[in-house]
UniProtKB/Swiss-Prot annotation:
Protein modification: Phosphorylated with a circadian rhythmicity.
Motif (Nuclear localization signal): 388-398
Keywords of this entry: Biological rhythms, Cytoplasm, Nucleus, Phosphoprotein, Repeat
PANTHER family, sorted: PROTEIN TIMELESS, TIMEOUT/TIMELESS-2
UniProt key word Cell division: no
Record's protein name: Protein timeless
Superkingdom of this protein's organism: Eukaryota
Quaternary structure annotation from Swiss-Prot or TrEMBL: Forms a heterodimer with period (PER); the complex then translocates into the nucleus.
């Protein structure tokens, strides 16, 4: 409860000055980020997962949900989705090369690996993914993972202390003198491999050599040498400068072969910048001497902001890939626990990393290579089915792993990107090991503990926020089998009707605050949307067992027979009020109703399914008032997205075509959009 209350404290407008950067004029740091960073360094994630799964979890289940909500209050689901996509894409490239020729274990004494890892703590011994066998095997596997989690929790604090000490010694060795090229290169082989690392030999193929990093650093210095450096600029500006410079070097990274040949005599040939200037010094030695002298501190700040491991570039062979600043996602309404409903289409829940507005390339928070073997084979193309299978095996490894995850370094200034990567790691572990237990416990207390005051919005948010990520990862059903149940859907339906009634009563009273009811109402709709969307996603998953498919089959039949769920959206659309409800809420209503119609249509075709009169049900939407609300949403046709517009046109098509009630569509707000 103390941690929950601390994280609930709002940020002040005063600048929080890190002691390390006091000499440079100050650096604005989020106190929330600093607290989270320090908590995860002390392995708060291990403790939380243990408390969620221990037999006494009922005593603090509600408080645990509130703490999780506070941890994620500044995180957007879009950001985590993109980071998880990159995490998967990086592992796919490694696995495809491992399948070609890698049969030898990594060298134990290799110095290319960092002692601080944040991703993929998997063991090759658990590579055989299960297809969801018997229930006894699942129970034994859960017990083994729980025991491994407890053992990992006990050993983590000692490991953190030791590795933090090693990091400080390594940083002192690097920054003691002005390093030349040979010294920096030698430093990259002085850190021993951690015994917990099981890194594949071929991973070095995905990272450029150190000489290419010198070339990138050289181009960065050339780009910024023509303008004065502002050491007191905010963190965002420094990070933006770094991103812009690295984005300009993308073309040079693609010419690996020619770059390696040219770098053999780089120290003796003049450096040629992209736009030569007569007054610019053009030798590598001059550039390195100037930049290590005058810009060493700024470079350290930039590297610290790009990665959770400050100084990692000096110690290991890492990849400095170009980063694009993410566009801020649109927010509509915020819940009590900080969840922001996003304007998204179901297509955005794809597991491919094709988004243009996210960070590209291999993320900095992935594990570095542990091998200097040159690339000798071209990467084989993988089918989508093979990619899904490799990703599934990666998650199976992660769920069975008892290795220690190092989430960061002690002396580091965390940025928002660092915290997002930190929570990406915790999200994977949470979904695999704690999410199922937490939702099950909270629902039990909501249904039985009438005397305990529980904010229902936390339950709605848990379903909305994390079920989207679980569907993206395509977790095995055993990890979400307590969420995808008819009891959960029935409770959401009941709360939807109850909140609609409470909102109507309070709206009639002058001076009453409607925001809590509007937030909960919106979260109920999005929770049902994610529930139904997850069913649609898992119907297309190929690795489900027969028991899991039978469970999904039964759930769809139950949804088809539930008239209250269908009538809920008729009620909510008819009671929509443009004066108090947002357009985002209307969009979520229309999209969720469309997904429900698809499930009802497919449920009627299943074996044992009841005949559902969809035409009779759709006729309840064929009113001037409801179609006027559809017209309000259609006004923003250009920005809605393809799926949202498809939901609108499908309903209008059935009303005007199948039902023949075209008169309800003859409204100025609809005709005006069609006439454009």
């Amino acid at each position: 409860m103390l941690l929950r209350n601390i994280l609930h404290i709002p940020e002040t407008h005063a600048h929080f000055l890190m002691p390390v950067l006091q000499s440079s004029g100050g650096h604005q740091v989020s106190m929330q980020n600093t607290i989270l960073w320090n908590l995860f360094i002390q392995s708060i994630d291990k403790l939380l997962l243990y408390l969620m799964t221990c037999p006494q979890r009922a005593l603090w289940g509600v408080t645990m949900v509130q703490l999780i909500a506070m941890i994620y209050k500044d995180q957007h689901v879009n950001t985590l989705q993109k980071l998880l996509n990159l995490w998967f894409e990086a592992s796919l490239s490694e696995s495809s090369e491992d399948n070609e020729s890698n049969t030898s274990p990594p060298k134990k004494g290799s110095g290319d690996s960092s002692p601080m890892l944040t991703s993929d703590p998997t063991s090759d011994s658990s590579d055989n993914g299960s297809n969801g066998g018997g229930s006894s095997g699942k129970k034994e596997g859960c017990d083994e993972r729980r025991q491994a989690l407890r053992e990992g929790t006990e050993a983590t604090l000692q490991e953190v202390s030791r590795k933090g000490h090693d990091y400080q010694n390594a940083m002192a060795r690097v920054t003691a003198d002005k390093p030349d090229i040979s010294e920096v290169a030698s430093d990259s082989f002085e850190v021993p491999c951690s015994p917990q690392q099981h890194l594949n030999t071929e991973e070095a193929m995905d990272d450029i050599d150190y000489e290419e990093q010198v070339q990138e650093y050289e181009q960065e210095a050339a780009a910024v040498s023509s303008e004065p450096l502002n050491l007191s600029q905010p963190a965002n500006n420094v990070n933006y400068t770094t991103n812009a410079v690295y984005a300009s070097t993308t073309a040079t990274e693609t010419q690996t072969t020619s770059s390696l040949c040219a770098m053999t005599s780089l120290c003796y040939e003049p450096f040629k910048p992209p736009a030569p200037l007569p007054t610019r010094r053009n030798t590598l030695s001059e550039m390195l001497s100037d930049n290590y002298t005058s810009h060493s501190h700024v470079s350290a700040v930039k590297l610290g902001q790009k990665s959770s491991h400050a100084g990692q570039l000096q110690l290991t062979k890492g990849k400095c890939c170009p980063q694009k600043r993410e566009c801020p996602s649109s927010q509509s309404e915020l819940s009590d626990c900080g969840y922001a409903t996003q304007v998204e289409n179901p297509e955005s829940i794809s597991t491919s990393s094709n988004d243009d507005d996210g960070p590209q390339g291999k993320p900095q928070h992935q594990k570095p290579p542990c091998n200097t073997k040159p690339r000798n084979k071209q990467r084989t193309l993988m089918s989508p089915q093979d990619k899904k299978e490799l990703r599934r095996k990666k998650l199976v490894k992660r769920s069975k792993s008892s290795l220690i995850n190092m989430k960061g370094l002690v002396q580091h200034t965390p940025t928002n990107y660092d915290i997002s990567n930190l929570l990406k790691e915790f999200t994977v572990d949470f979904l695999l090991k704690g999410y199922n237990y937490l939702v099950e416990e909270l629902l039990k207390q909501l249904l039985t503990s009438a005397k305990v005051l529980i904010d229902t919005s936390h339950f709605f948010w848990l379903v909305t926020f994390f079920l989207k990520l679980a569907a993206q990862l395509e977790l095995d059903m055993e990890h979400i089998d307590s969420i995808l149940t008819y009891d959960v859907l029935s409770y959401l339906t009941y709360e939807g009707v109850s909140l609609c009634e409470q909102l109507e009563l309070n709206a009639q009273q002058e001076g009453s605050d409607l925001q809590p009811y509007l937030r909960r109402m919106h979260l109920v709709v999005t929770a049902i949307r994610e529930f139904l969307q997850t069913i649609e996603t898992y119907n297309k998953v190929s690795h489900l067992s027969e028991d899991d498919r039978l469970r999904l089959h039964q759930l769809q039949l139950q949804i088809g027979a539930t008239t209250d769920l269908r009538c809920l959206f008729v009620l909510l659309l008819r009671r929509f009020n443009p004066r108090i409800h947002s357009k985002q809420y209307l969009q979520d209503l229309v999209v969720t109703n469309h997904i429900l119609m698809l499930i009802l249509d497919s449920a009627a075709k299943l074996e044992g399914g009841q005949t559902i009169g969809l035409s009779e049900h759709i006729s309840q939407f064929a009113t001037l008032e409801v179609m006027h609300y559809y017209g309000i949403l259609l006004e923003d046709f250009d920005n809605n997205g393809e799926f949202v517009n498809d939901c609108i046109f499908t309903m209008m098509h059935h009303i005007g075509g199948d039902l023949g009630q075209i008169g309800v569509l003859f409204q100025p707000i609809i005709l005006k959009t069609y006439s454009r």
